[in-house]
A protein has these predicted regions:
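Walker A/P-loop phosphate-binding motif and the immediately C-terminal alpha-helix
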Residues: 51-88, 201, 205
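Short glycine/serine/threonine-rich phosphate/pyrophosphate-binding segments
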Residues: 61-69, 90-94, 169-174, 196-200
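Phosphate-binding loop that captures ATP/GTP phosphates
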Residues: 80-82, 86-133, 137, 144, ...
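Conserved catalytic-core segment of NTP-binding enzymes
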Residues: 160-226
Length: 226
């Protein structure tokens, strides 16, 4: 009497030997892509000597102006510098760098930054928009995925400094960058003399302490207007 074949079942209810379902295949591909991007971010982080985060607790205090000025000042001293504009919904760095209308170049799956004055390399969401009036209406997970792509899929090359310009507030964006890029050197906090701006800057300092990222300095912008 012939023995009955033994059939085993996978956790999703399918028989072994059938191969992964379409959903499982997508999950595996997504997990592999995330793992590969994480490794790429770590490798890129090792090629960048210094990484500086520029934050503000409140909008309209001149944070992007400070980021751009800091990057250009470092470039004037002979350093290789890049600016990563993480403000997905309000990217202003390309306009300040005279790079309006530029587009990013992609080669062999790697994004090449635009180059501005003094050779400063720039990555920004603005380069992907049809025009400056186009809004970016994305939910959090999509924004965070774009940020990780801006870090892991960009060919920054060897940099002395990467200046990272964030949107106002202490939301997911700085947390994502701090977790994605190893060895952040420090944070520059931009504020104005108004009481509400100073209150928000104190929140930014507390936020930096929670990330264990040292505060390099606090810039009081527009102090001559009070």
């Amino acid at each position: 009497m012939a023995e009955s074949p033994i059939t085993t079942f996978t956790p999703n209810g399918g028989q072994s030997g059938e191969g992964p379902t379409v959903q499982q295949q997508k999950q595996m591909e997504s997990a592999y892509a995330n793992m590969r991007r994480k490794m790429a971010m770590q490798e890129i982080g090792r090629k960048i000597k210094h990484k500086i985060m520029v934050l503000s607790g409140k909008g309209g205090v001149g944070k992007s102006t400070v980021s751009t000025g800091l990057a250009l000042s470092l470039a004037q001293q002979g350093h290789a510098v890049g600016i990563l504009d993480i403000d997905i919904t309000g990217p202003n760095v390309p306009k300040m760098m005279g790079l309006e209308g530029k587009r990013l170049h992609v080669e062999q799956g790697r994004i090449h930054p635009a180059q501005g004055h003094l050779g400063v390399k720039v990555i920004s969401m603005a380069f992907l928009l049809e025009d400056e009036d186009t809004p970016v209406v994305w939910r959090g997970p999509i924004k965070l995925g774009a940020i990780q792509q801006f870090i892991g899929d960009v060919e920054w090359g060897e940099l002395d400094y990467l200046v990272i310009d964030f949107p106002p507030g202490t939301s997911d964006e700085p947390l994502t960058v701090a977790q994605s890029l190893p060895d952040i050197d420090g944070m520059v906090i931009v504020t104005t003399p108004q009481d509400v701006a100073l209150l928000d800057s104190r929140k930014s300092i507390t936020f930096s302490e929670s990330l264990k990222v040292p505060v390099l300095g606090v810039v009081e912008n527009m102090s001559g207007y009070t």
